[in-house]
Amino acid sequence: MDLLFGRRKTPEELLRQNQRALTRAMRELDRERQKLEAQEKKIIIDIKKMAKQGQMDAVKIMAKDLVRTRRYVKKFITMRANVQAVSLKIQTLKSNNSMALAMKGVTKAMATMNRQLKLPQIQKIMMEFEKQAGIMDMKEELMNDAIDDAMGDEDDEEESDAVVSQVLDELGLNLTDELATLPPPGGSLAAGEGRAAEAAAALADADADLEERLKNLRRD
């Protein structure tokens, strides 16, 4: 039985075979339990029927059968639980075996990579990469400086002149608008002198009124 097509079965194949056998056993136990449960229901119906007819001897015999049937049902439930526990253990073994095989493969791959990984060569490659990258940066900087020297001055002068012209134009418009909103100089001075004269006259009237009241008080 350990040979499959002239060769020995692997542990994985043996585990799968035993797993299938346990699954079939659990199905058989479930079917037998269901038959016993159906028989239990039938016995209960017969007991009630005989009890109504007054046949107590038959009732006692069927009651014993009912007790035995219920015990068998419990035994089948226990047996199925045990078989299921064994099936779970086999499944755990399969999982552990799969994990071990995977770890074995990973270990081999890591060993191969470590053998192929030569640190001096990698270090040399990185140093050469940094060197070439530095040379490329220097060349790019020199090219940018040359382009700026050749094209940047004229463009900068033209752009700066345009900005200055725009700013001066905006300032000129703003100053013109503000000057237009100011009142004429003569009108402002005349209005100020008129308000000062009115204030002086009001003060003089108040002083005269106060002086008149003091005179009246002295007469009284």
Swiss-Prot record:
Pfam families recorded: Snf7
Localization (cell): Late endosome membrane; Cytoplasm
Coiled-coil ranges from the UniProt annotation: 12-52, 195-220
Record membrane topology: Peripheral membrane protein
Keywords assigned by UniProt, alphabetized: Acetylation, Coiled coil, Cytoplasm, Endosome, Membrane, Protein transport, Transport
Presence of the UniProt keyword Membrane in the record: yes
Gene Ontology BP, a term: late endosome to vacuole transport
Motif (MIT-interacting motif): 208-218
Cell membrane among keywords: no
Residue numbers bearing the N-acetylmethionine modification: M1
Transmembrane segments: none
GO CC annotations, alphabetized: ESCRT III complex; late endosome membrane; multivesicular body; nuclear envelope
Family under the similarity heading: Belongs to the SNF7 family.
Function field: Probable core component of the endosomal sorting required for transport complex III (ESCRT-III) which is involved in multivesicular bodies (MVBs) formation and sorting of endosomal cargo proteins into MVBs. MVBs contain intraluminal vesicles (ILVs) that are generated by invagination and scission from the limiting membrane of the endosome and mostly are delivered to lysosomes enabling degradation of membrane proteins, such as stimulated growth factor receptors, lysosomal enzymes and lipids.
Subunit structure: Probable core component of the endosomal sorting required for transport complex III (ESCRT-III). ESCRT-III components are thought to multimerize to form a flat lattice on the perimeter membrane of the endosome.
Protein name: Charged multivesicular body protein 2a
Record organism: Gallus gallus
Biological classification of the source: Eukaryota, Metazoa, Chordata, Craniata, Vertebrata
Gene: CHMP2A
